[in-house]
Regions:
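Short, acidic/polar
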Residues: 51-69, 134-145, 209-219, 321-326
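Substrate-binding cleft of extracellular glycoside hydrolase catalytic domains
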Residues: 89-196, 294
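C-terminal motif of bacterial Sec signal peptides marking the signal peptidase cleavage site
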Residues: 16-18
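Noncatalytic carbohydrate-binding groove/subsite architecture in carbohydrate-active enzymes
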Residues: 131, 162-294, 300, 304
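Catalytic domains of carbohydrate-active enzymes, especially glycoside hydrolases
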Residues: 61-85
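Aromatic-rich peripheral "rim/lid" segments of glycoside hydrolase catalytic domains that contact
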Residues: 24-31, 305-326, 330-422
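Boundary/entry segment of secreted carbohydrate-active catalytic domains
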Residues: 22-65
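Conserved, mostly hydrophobic/aromatic
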Residues: 77, 155, 229, 294-296, ...
Length: 422
């Protein structure tokens, strides 16, 4: 063999060995690789700044948000619909950022919104029939998944679309099952990547973790059809609707205010864990064993309603920050992905009431101020040089924890809660 042939042969062998040892490229990284992986922290994302979604975030605004989230280690985003331009623009922005910086890494759990017939029309919703708009929504999601296979790793069919308290739009599980099966068939045909995971993101009860009325044959088939279960749990909301775990028990009335609050937050974590376990138990009772991740959980920082001064007294930055710390610690240690709700405050959600809790779930305020939950990241300098809406990332309360704590209320006793709700 000539020296040239020997050199070429040796070069090919080295290249082959190098390829075998090289880390996966982004188009090879799959949902199975990133979900439950502590190196891929997840969050729910919406970039709306105004009181209406008629004003879409600009490409520049989306880009500054992505830089902020990447700086804090976020690598998976959950979005909710593809009806509007935000998500297509977001995917363009992520692609641009990847071209600008080979080390930039961000993946998307793409939500396709599902409605029942007459949802949001002023007419009586028909929960037995799906909206004719659903087909177009699914097709848009498919198009984007094909266009950005290196970014879109999951499609979620519906958001809280099966839970009965979503009275404006919920559908029966057979509708979700129909579209999940449709997407799974596209994977089998090679029209979508086989590694693309399909799920639906819904309340723990919709996945069989609560009332037995949800234990239907269609739900059983859905659990078998999805690649993993994406469940929601909200101790904060349940501090009003199912408050037993939240209220200060008689044997703790002698504790300090700080101890009462910490005890309530520990019980809140256990509440979320119990709901997670209930979904897992139902799934296993069907002879199914697949991953379960948390598609949504969060804790608002402001409320003038059920969770405020005259209610369960759950909402403030301290409790929200403590919940964020507790839920992150547990899920990371348990290899559970947690799409924390949410990255930034969005004021369109309760546009008529600036103090409504739905507007205040973000880790950041709209103006870019970092809430108590992530003050430590500001201290570490992770956001140095970054801005939102032209403003540098600073701490709420100017970083004064004593000022923050003046607004923190102790959870009520059962008697106090009862009097407030007479």
């Amino acid at each position: 063999m000539s020296m040239l042939k020997k050199y070429i042969t040796l070069s090919i062998l080295i290249m082959m060995l190098g390829c075998n040892k090289a880390p996966k490229q982004e188009n090879q990284i799959t949902a199975a690789d990133i979900l439950g992986n502590q190196n891929y922290i997840a969050i729910s994302y919406g970039g709306y700044r105004q009181k209406t979604r008629d004003v879409q975030p600009t490409m520049k605004e989306l880009k500054e948000d992505m830089k902020i989230l990447a700086a804090m280690g976020i690598k998976i985003l959950r979005t909710y619909n593809v009806q509007l331009q935000q998500v297509p623009n977001l995917l363009k922005v992520i692609k641009e950022l990847k071209l600008e910086d080979p080390n930039f890494e961000m993946y998307v759990m793409l939500g396709a919104w599902i409605d029942c017939k007459n949802a949001w029309t002023g007419k009586t919703p028909n929960h037995e029939i799906e909206s004719e708009q659903n087909e177009g929504e699914i097709n848009r999601a498919v198009t984007l998944a094909k266009q950005y296979p290196d970014i879109v790793k999951i499609i979620a069919v519906g958001n809280e679309a099966m839970v009965n308290w979503a009275t404006n739009y919920f559908v029966r599980p057979n509708v979700i099952l129909k579209w999940v099966n449709y997407l799974q068939d596209l994977k089998k045909k090679g029209e979508l990547p086989k590694s693309l995971w399909i799920t639906s993101s819904d309340d723990f009860s919709s996945w069989g973790g609560g009332d037995s009325s949800y234990h239907t044959k269609d739900l059983e088939e859905l659990i078998k059809a999805v690649d993993y279960i994406s469940m929601h749990t909200y101790p904060m909301h349940n501090s009003h609707y199912n408050p037993t775990f939240w209220l200060v028990p008689e044997n703790e009335e002698g504790l300090s205010d700080e101890e009462k609050i910490e005890s309530a937050m520990q019980r809140s974590l256990k509440f979320a864990q119990k709901q997670y376990d209930s979904v897992s138990n139902h799934m296993k009772s069907l002879g199914v064993n697949k991953p379960i991740h948390i598609g949504e959980t969060g804790w608002a920082t402001v409320s003038d309603g059920h969770y405020g001064v005259e209610g369960s007294r759950a909402c403030d930055e301290y409790k929200s920050g403590r919940y964020y710390e507790l839920i992150r610690d547990w899920t990371i240690k348990s290899n559970i992905s947690c799409f924390y709700f949410e990255a930034f405050d969005e004021q369109w959600k309760d546009a008529r009431n600036t103090m409504g809790s739905e507007n205040h779930f973000g880790l950041f305020k709209i103006n870019g101020e970092a809430k108590y939950a992530i003050w430590d990241l500001v201290d570490k300098g992770l956001f140095d040089g970054l801005t939102r809406n032209g403003k540098h990332i600073t701490k709420t309360y100017n970083g004064d924890k004593d000022a923050l704590k003046k607004e923190v209320l102790v959870p009520p006793t059962p008697e106090e809660f009862s009097i407030a709700h007479q």
